[in-house]
């Protein structure tokens, strides 16, 4: 069978880096295949699809050796949707894609509405793109991609910024499209559940950008589990097992593991009551631009707690963080930090007390090298250079960035950029550390190391406030969970109580950690058996 996409002995090196990011890669993909590319952070996954899509070297400079066979009409959905938008409004952005297909203007409005409905982008077509949440931007990017009707669709973590329910909806949509149109699709993904089940092949890269496995999902998962764990690659929680089998068989190894995890969470279940309040909101209105999201928000955050803020895309989670750090102006209501009104803190003192890690790491980079980016804050505070050097080198080592110390932050992979953004904040000993999607784009090993570092910082008394879509992370780390849903603050309490509250979980469309789902469905099985 003739190849639809292929490369032979492909080696790619970016000019500012001494070593290739991809090394002697050879593969062949047939028309209609669904292929998942896996590998640790920085292994060249995004580079590989950029070469196959024709972005490298046509639009991005790099030294490319080997042979590549591409299709003429390709579409790519990137990790960061902002990087591919060129218009101001939602309908204009989709229309731009349709214009590239020479669609008559009089047909566009109906097609735009159809595409928005297909990706569940439920906003006014005239909405300014910059006012959309990260997840809504991902949906818009997908609509633009589908408008092009390309021969091959490339997806670089297409649901990374979506809430769990939205993530499953998009993957179900893509699975439906692939079945209806025999569409060739190439994916790069960190979180495998919901996508690996319908892939034809899995290609596994190592840290050096070499292919170490290429086969069916089941074969690769079973044969290379040790290599994947060592490389820090997330594994699916259920696949290749069947969920129905796990629930029905209480002696199944996964059943035993889920029961033990549930009991451990139950024992850990407690609320902190004796700590002082470090952040308090009073009649606060969450608003972004002219849009009001939540009115009259009252909540307390206690010193030393790990607080998780969850909810659907557009519910105000990131906006709340920006209000707390004064990046978004407060139009109504009040925020108090350590009993003092937020308006009364000077910028310098506020940022010495609270650090903020953006959802998009590039927004906080201001230096030309990774080393200088981490060192910048200490130098601004006139630390002795010996102290700056010592602390910076320590953080480079702990976050696996030593070999990138002299490169520009913008040339890092998304996972490496995220590690750098957190490392710059951990240079200091702030009272409050605020993180927007801290594990976004991380492989399992680096995510675990990051969480270990944050837990250590919490043990030293730092208050951690994070926005996340990772419910396992919430369950493992959070002392307090805040749920924002459809313009309301609907929950304030422990993870255990939240995930055990079936009615609330259902109404908020939360996808709970598997051990809670297992216990709920196991009760149903036992009830039917009786």
Feature-to-residue mapping (PLM):
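Conserved ABC ATPase signature
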Residues: 128-132, 408-412
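Conserved beta-strand-loop-alpha-helix hinge in the C-terminal portion
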Residues: 210-233, 488-511
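ABC ATPase nucleotide-binding domains
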Residues: 228-279, 501, 505-530
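Helix-to-loop junction immediately C-terminal to a conserved catalytic motif
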Residues: 53, 325
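Conserved ABC ATPase "signature" region
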Residues: 107-124, 386-404
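A short, surface-exposed alpha-helical micro-motif characterized by mixed small hydrophobic
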Residues: 195-197, 474-476
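Catalytic Walker B motif of ABC-type/P-loop ATPase nucleotide-binding domains
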Residues: 153-156, 433-436
């Amino acid at each position: 069978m003739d190849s639809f996409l292929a490369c032979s002995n492909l080696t790619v090196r970016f000019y500012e880096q001494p070593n290739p990011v991809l090394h002697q890669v050879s593969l062949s993909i047939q028309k209609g295949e669904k292929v998942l590319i896996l590998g640790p952070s920085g292994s060249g996954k995004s580079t590989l699809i950029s070469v196959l899509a024709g972005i490298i070297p046509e639009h991005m400079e790099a030294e490319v050796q080997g042979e590549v066979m591409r299709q003429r009409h390709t579409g790519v959905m990137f990790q960061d949707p902002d990087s591919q938008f060129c218009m101001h409004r939602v309908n204009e952005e989709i229309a731009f894609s349709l214009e590239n297909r020479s669609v008559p203007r009089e047909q566009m409005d109906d097609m735009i509405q159809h595409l928005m409905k297909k990706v569940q982008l439920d906003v006014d077509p005239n909405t300014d793109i910059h006012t959309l949440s990260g997840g809504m931007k991902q949906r818009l990017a997908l609509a633009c991609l589908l408008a092009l009707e390309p021969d091959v669709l490339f997806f670089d973590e297409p649901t990374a910024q979506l809430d769990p329910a939205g993530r499953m909806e998009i993957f179900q949509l893509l699975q439906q499209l692939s079945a209806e149109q025999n569409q060739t699709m190439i994916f790069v993904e960190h979180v495998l559940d919901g996508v690996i089940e319908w892939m034809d092949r899995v290609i596994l890269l190592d840290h050096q950008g070499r292919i170490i496995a290429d086969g069916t999902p089941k074969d690769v998962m079973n044969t290379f589990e040790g290599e994947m764990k060592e490389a820090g690659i997330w594994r699916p929680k259920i696949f290749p097992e069947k969920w129905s089998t796990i629930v029905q068989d209480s002696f199944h190894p996964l059943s035993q593991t889920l029961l033990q995890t549930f009991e451990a969470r139950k024992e850990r279940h407690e609320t902190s009551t004796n700590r002082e309040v470090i952040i308090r909101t009073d009649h606060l209105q969450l608003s972004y631009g002219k849009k009001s999201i939540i009115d009259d928000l009252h909540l307390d955050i206690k010193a030393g707690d790990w607080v998780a803020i969850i909810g659907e895309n557009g519910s105000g989670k990131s906006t709340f963080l920006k209000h707390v750090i004064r990046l978004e102006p407060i139009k109504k209501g009040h925020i108090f930090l350590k009993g003092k009104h937020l308006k009364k803190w000077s910028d310098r003192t506020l940022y010495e007390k609270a650090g903020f890690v953006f959802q998009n790491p590039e927004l906080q980079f201001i230096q030309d090298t990774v080393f200088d980016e981490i060192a910048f804050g200490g130098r601004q505070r006139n630390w002795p250079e010996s102290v700056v050097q010592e602390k910076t080198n320590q953080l480079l080592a702990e976050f696996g960035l030593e070999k990138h110390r002299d490169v520009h932050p913008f040339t890092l992979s998304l996972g490496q950029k995220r590690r750098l953004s957190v490392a710059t904040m951990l240079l200091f000993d702030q009272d409050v550390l605020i993180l927007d999607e801290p594990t976004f784009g991380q492989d399992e090993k680096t995510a675990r190391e990051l969480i270990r570092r944050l837990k250590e910082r919490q043990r030293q008394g730092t208050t951690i406030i994070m926005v996340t879509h990772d419910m396992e992370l919430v369950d493992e780390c959070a002392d307090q969970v805040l749920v924002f849903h459809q313009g309301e603050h609907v929950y304030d309490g422990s993870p255990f109580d939240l995930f055990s509250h079936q009615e609330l979980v259902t109404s908020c469309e939360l996808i709970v950690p598997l051990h809670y789902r297992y216990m709920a469905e196991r009760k149903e099985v036992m009830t039917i058996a009786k």
